[in-house]
């Protein structure tokens, strides 16, 4: 089979409504007003799923039916790279390592309900000096996984600023999920699970806690995203609608021992 690019889509089925914060009001940092609901327009954005579903061959030799771009965003040090390596390679980057410079990506093909779904996962730098670089990649993203570190209160407090940035640069119907990472660090936890749940509910986001070290909920997070994107690309309107929030609540594994 010859190599070919996946064609662009003209639209997906019933894109979900995302609730995002209003723009930052102060120059001293992002202080949000009441969140506002952003509803997608009648036409799908240019980053939509493929128009037709025909097997394609990726650069690694893996065949896939449909491909999507997923971005990992959040402060530096929240574990974006470790989460990606755990999902892609089933390994954990132990010890110290150099933070991501700019942006990097890896591919993985999943079997989702009989369809080969390729996720092109972009790992972004969280440092402020690289923001102008990552902004350019938001526009083409189909999904965003927004991470904070449960042992770092600042990374949690900055989630609202990240949501403001997403509102400005990403597509209106981008799939969003909030992840509280490093849940294995029980003794160092400073952000309660309930706080993450409350914030996610405020902005209408699916939420779960993850651990790149143990693998807790890592595969589930990416699988849930793949299922949602696959559903949007489906041609048959009669197909039962996949509900991302319900799937995450049903399949997610809690860590009650880590609650404060």
Swiss-Prot record:
Pfam family, one: Ras
Chain spans, region Disordered: 1-56
EC number: 3.6.5.2
Membrane topology: Lipid-anchor
Compartments, as annotated in UniProt: Cytoplasmic vesicle, Secretory vesicle membrane; Golgi apparatus membrane
Residues holding Mg(2+): 81, 100, 123
GO-annotated biological processes: exocrine system development; Golgi to plasma membrane protein transport; regulated exocytosis; regulation of exocytosis; regulation protein catabolic process at presynapse
Lipidation (S-geranylgeranyl cysteine): 257-258
Residue interval(s) of motif Switch 1: 90-105
Binding residue positions for GTP: 76-82, 99-100, 126, 181-182, 184, 212-213
Tissue/organ expression: Detected in zymogenic cells in the stomach.
Subunit field text: Interacts with ADRA2B. Interacts with RIMS1.
Function as written in the Swiss-Prot or TrEMBL entry: The small GTPases Rab are key regulators of intracellular membrane trafficking, from the formation of transport vesicles to their fusion with membranes. Rabs cycle between an inactive GDP-bound form and an active GTP-bound form that is able to recruit to membranes different set of downstream effectors directly responsible for vesicle formation, movement, tethering and fusion. RAB26 mediates transport of ADRA2A and ADRA2B from the Golgi to the cell membrane. Plays a role in the maturation of zymogenic granules and in pepsinogen secretion in the stomach.
Free-text comment on this protein's domains from its UniProt entry: Switch 1, switch 2 and the interswitch regions are characteristic of Rab GTPases and mediate the interactions with Rab downstream effectors. The switch regions undergo conformational changes upon nucleotide binding which drive interaction with specific sets of effector proteins, with most effectors only binding to GTP-bound Rab.
Family the UniProt entry places it in: Belongs to the small GTPase superfamily. Rab family.
Protein name: Ras-related protein Rab-26
């Amino acid at each position: 089979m010859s190599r070919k690019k996946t064609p662009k889509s003209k639209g997906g089925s019933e894109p979900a409504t995302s609730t995002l914060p209003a723009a930052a009001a102060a120059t001293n940092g992002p202080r949000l007003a009441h969140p506002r609901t952003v509803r997608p327009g009648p036409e799908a954005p240019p980053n939509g799923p493929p128009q037709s579903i025909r097997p394609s061959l990726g650069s690694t030799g893996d065949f896939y039916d449909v491909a999507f771009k997923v971005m990992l965003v959040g402060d530096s040090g929240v574990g974006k790279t470790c989460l990606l390596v755990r999902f892609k390679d089933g390994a954990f980057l132990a010890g110290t390592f150099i933070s991501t410079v700019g942006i990097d990506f890896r591919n993985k093909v999943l079997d989702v309900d009989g369809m080969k779904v390729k996720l092109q996962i972009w790992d972004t730098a969280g440092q402020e000096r690289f923001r102008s670089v990552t902004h350019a990649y938001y526009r083409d993203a189909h999904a965003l996984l927004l991470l904070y570190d449960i042992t770092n209160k600042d990374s949690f407090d900055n989630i609202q600023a990240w949501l403001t940035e997403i509102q400005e640069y990403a597509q209106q119907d981008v799939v969003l999920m909030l992840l509280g990472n490093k849940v294995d660090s029980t003794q160092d936890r400073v952000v309660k699970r309930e706080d993450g749940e409350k914030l996610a509910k405020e902005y209408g986001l699916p939420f779960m806690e993850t651990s790149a070290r143990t693998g807790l909920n890592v595969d589930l997070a990416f699988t849930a995203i793949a299922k949602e994107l696959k559903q949007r690309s489906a041609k048959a309107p009669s197909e039962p609608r996949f509900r991302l929030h319900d799937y995450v609540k049903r399949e997610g594994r809690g860590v009650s021992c880590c609650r404060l």
